[in-house]
Structures are given as structure tokens and as C-alpha cells.
């Protein structure tokens, strides 16, 4: 049993394998947060809450004749409200019909159930009755009648707790939600830091570690998507926490739209974290009887450092976010023509690339942007999802059949949420584009946004997508989104509901994705937003892999994939071998290094194989063989960050089988050093008393012996370390295979 409700002591305790989370109802009905951390018993932990009288921190009216020391401004609250005495960052803010913004939430009941709750129209962790339990706690404003249902999903074996909120208008009038966060989490004490993951286009999710100081710190997005700039995943940790030790808490927002994560350290050094939809673009009207569901937050806690925390998130995403046929099925090695041809291609040109790829073992050919409408550059054609048979020289079906005839699968690129001003769709439906009446729209990549908050737009796009998918043997779709949203306005919404547009857009996107996958359940969907501009748990609910970044440079990818790995498994990271000089940086890196880095992801190619030498093709064929050999480690192994690219010349990572039977260690030198010291790394996840054969993987296919095989115990490897081969040139890479004997 994972959820314990003690009606006598009025506590709710959530127990996972290694952690405990507890709440308590106080004498005045306030739901307090007492504890989240290492596993303990079900004892009432409210004794930890300080009861001190502090000036300018008020108390409830009912407490004036009793104990006036418990103030909402100081108490650790499970779901904080604006306007009634808590001056810290709040989770809920409303505008009542009389214009006031006050809300007081008091405990009104609870419900327990087996299995995991779901959220209408939104992605969420899923689990059956053997895997999860649900706790619902009902809070009510005694004055207005507004109700808030706090929902908790407990996946005991995974050390995962999920949270979501349903707000129900039980008042007699209209209520406007100005802020409705998915969670509030308070820490009574501790000197914390937090890890956030910032970036930009083509350089996403760079790790940043900063102290949580007095005042408010925040990350978020008002771009209509989770964005390249801040990822909706963060970690709060104690100061001495590292990969293998220390207490840390992870927060992942299961949402692909605008978000806000904010922390505040208050007057008595307590820390609060709020996570939810960004309130700047949000105002949701609830008529009497109507309700609003927030997106979900995934929480996990580890006392064994960032490595264990990452494993918790990797497992819940692989097993309880990713769905469908491709959740566990081996995904094909693909080649994408984008960096090989850009818009300049014909059907014959694509088939020639595919033919070379098939001979080398590539299993899926993906035709990227430029196959539809009038689309020879990025200035026109978006929205006209009809194959350009004149450009291709054949029908889409004929092209697909030719690809399939090579023994490959056929994939295709879409950008359904965007529209070109120079398109037949825009000329027919200019009101479908997102723009403010009387203002010239802001353009990005010469394109505008389709109003996915409108059901007629959703229905049209879904019909077009399904029509294209039905017309050819298409097994894969790359779903792109190449700009941020601004000029937010929908012609389908009245003025007072324009604050709903951004969230309705996201609900519309999820509806279309769900509709397409329901119609084509065998389809492999890869998410993309100019690379990693929408890399979040929400999109992973629909697409089990996401193009990690438009930056395909192997050395830059070390940083990008390192940061991404804190919250997301490598099996979700789209990673390709591209041409050199690299198209983003101009850097020339060895083919073996490019392959090694791409193998820390879904693995594929993005270049014109016709331009490769025969020696390079032999190396490509060998890379594909190696990746297939170690695929299980990539798809389901435990991932360890052995060194960081931020402070190490040699970047090393490990993927180990959960039963410790084998492991693959990959190392990339960012530059060569003269007369450098020996480099040791310390593998993890091995069996101490077992022996392992240690051998170098032949990435190049030339069968040269670059490291002598040896046999070492797991204890020796993990404590004595493994000496890596040195770098004989800039960007040298090695893969070392450990096999249990």
C-alpha cells in the first residue's frame, strides 16, 4: 500500500520504495506540507513546522482567540493561494465575480483508488491498478464555494509521485482563473541550489547550477511552446549533491506549451517551488459548474545524487509516458535528406540516396521539407499538404513504393501548425492564421501560425494528414514546429476569452496528434521544433523520440545531450551523423566520433551518402552494425554520466544493462593535449564480485587492435577505475565494451 490516510491524526502519507511524502490538515482546515525526502514511517511529521509569532505575517480570523502563531504567510502549504495572507509566490489566483482576488482553501474530504488518474485532453503518466495508487484531496473555499481537487498518483516502485489539479466553479457567479499552477512544494529548511537547463536554437538544455537565494527566481516560456530557451524540467538539490550522493528533487512538467517554474526563499529561509502554466498569457473563465484541469507534474526524490534521480525519470518516461507500438519495439536506423539536399531534390535524387543507404544497413528513409505545394524555399507553401508531383517527378505513392522496394521504410516531414502567407490555404482562410486584427503579424522563418485553438482548423489539418498518410506507404512522420507564437489572438474567441487561446492551442495540438495516432497506430512519430524547442514529457506522450537539436555537430552535441540526459532517457533523443564540415559550426570531426555521439541517441544519418568515399561507407556500415549490437543498452539500459563536458576535456558516458551483465562506455576527447596525464573513469552499475571482459569496440571497421583485451572484476573497475586510451588527434572517440563472464 502506497497511500496512507490517517483520519485520527489527519495526515496523508505517500510511500514509495525509497521516499516519503506527507501532508496534514491543521486545526483550521489548512492543508500543510510536512515532509518530502528519504523514506520514513507514517508518523505525524507536523512537529517540524515552526510555530512562531512574526510581525506582519497575519493569521486566520478564527485563530485570533486561539493560536495566532500559525500564519499562511509562514506555513508550508500544499497548494498556496493569493490574496488571503500568504505573500509568497502562489499556485492559485482568481478574479471573483465581485472583482476581488481572494481565495481561502480548506480541507473538505479525500478519496483513494487503485491505478492512476488521467486528465481529459492532456498527456499524463499512465499506470494500471498493479502499478499505481491515486489520492484525491478536495479543498473548498468556505466563503465562495470554489473547489480545488488535488490529485496525486503514486508509482511506488519507481519513486515517482505525480500531481495535477482540477478547479471546479461551485460559486453562484463567474470566476476567472488568473493563475492555476499544477503544484506547490515547500521545504521548511535547507540551503538549496537548483539546476535549470537553458539554451537557444541549436544549443538547447545547457546545465546551469545556481543557489536559491532570497527572493524569486524563475524560468519559463511565453513562446507558445516549452521552447529552446528553458526546459520544463528542473532539479532542486542540497549544495553538496553530485552524481552519486546527496539529496535532490526533480520536477518535470508534462506539457508542451507555455510554463513557469519559480522558486522563492522567504523571510525565514524556507523554500517554495511552483510549477504550472505561465500566467502571463493565461486567463480562463469558469461559469458556474464548469471545471479546469491543469497539466501534470512528475516529481521524484533521490538521496543518491543526480544519477539515481535521472534513472527514476528515465524509467517513468520509457514505461509510463511513451506509448504505443514503438514504446518497446526496436526503432529503425534512419537517414534524413535535409542536410544532404535541403529543398533541392527530386524523387530520383532521393531514391539514389536511399539506395546507397539501404546497401549499408539503413532501415528508414525520411523525406524532409519541400515535397508539397509550392515549396522550393521557406517563403511559401506551408499549409498546402498536397504532394508536388511535378517536383518529385512521380506521385507520393510511387516514391514510397520505390523506397519500400529497396527494403526500407518510408517517412515524411510535416509542419502542420504553421502556414505561409503565400499558400493556397492562407488565401482561402486568412482568418485561420494567428494575428491581431489591425496589426501586421510578426513573421519568423517567413511563416505564421495556424490557429489550433479552433476546432475547424484542427479537423481540417487532421483530415489532410490522414489523407496523405493513406495515399502512400508511410511508416514514420517527423512533426516540426519552426517558430515561436506571438500576436496571440483567435477570431473564434470573444475578447474576454483571449487569455484562453494559448492553452486551447495546446489542447488542439494534442487532439490532432491523438487523432492521427488513433487512425494510424503503427506510425512512428518523431517530434521536432527547430530541433529541441519542444523537448518535453508532454510531446513524448505522443512521439517516443524528439529531434534533440538542429545542431548536429558532434562536439556541440556532447553538451546538448549531456544536459538533456538529466530529465530524459537517451532513447528519446534524436541524434544523427551529419556531413563535415558541419553545417552549423564548420567543424571537421572524424566519422567515428560522429557515430559514437549519435549512438547516445536514436541514431541515424543526415547527409548525402552519394558524396561519401568507399572507405567512409565501410565505416558507416560498421557503425550501424555496432549500434544494432548495442541497441538494448541504448533503449533500456541505465545511463551514467561519468564526466561532464562543462569541466572535462574527455567526455565519458556509460550505458549498462540493469542486470549488470554488460555495459558500453563511450569517450570523446574535445581536443588533443600534448604529453597529457592518463585518464581514468569509474564505471557504475556493475556487479562487484563478477569478472568482466574489457574490449575496445571497432567503430571504424578496419579491425585494428587499439587496446588489448583484459579481464577485471566489477569492484576493480568501479573503484580502481578504467584507464582510457589517449587522444591521437582532436575529437578522438572510443567505445569500450564490458561483458560479464
Question: Model-derived features: where do they sit?
Answer:
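C-terminal beta-sandwich/jelly-roll accessory domains of carbohydrate-active enzymes
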Residues: 671-741
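Active-site neighborhood of glycoside hydrolase catalytic domains
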Residues: 393-395, 429, 433-590, 602, ...
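Aromatic-lined carbohydrate-binding/catalytic grooves of carbohydrate-active enzymes
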Residues: 326-463, 476
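Short Pro-Gly-centered flexible turn/kink motifs
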Residues: 100-107, 284-303, 731-738
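Polysaccharide-binding surfaces and accessory modules of carbohydrate-active proteins
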Residues: 5, 10-17, 21, 31-264, ...
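Carbohydrate-binding surface patches
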Residues: 243, 644-687
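Conserved, mostly hydrophobic/aromatic
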Residues: 18, 165, 289, 335, ...
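Glycine-rich, aromatic-flanked loop segments that form ligand/cofactor-binding clefts
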Residues: 73-116, 245-257, 301-325, 362-369, ...
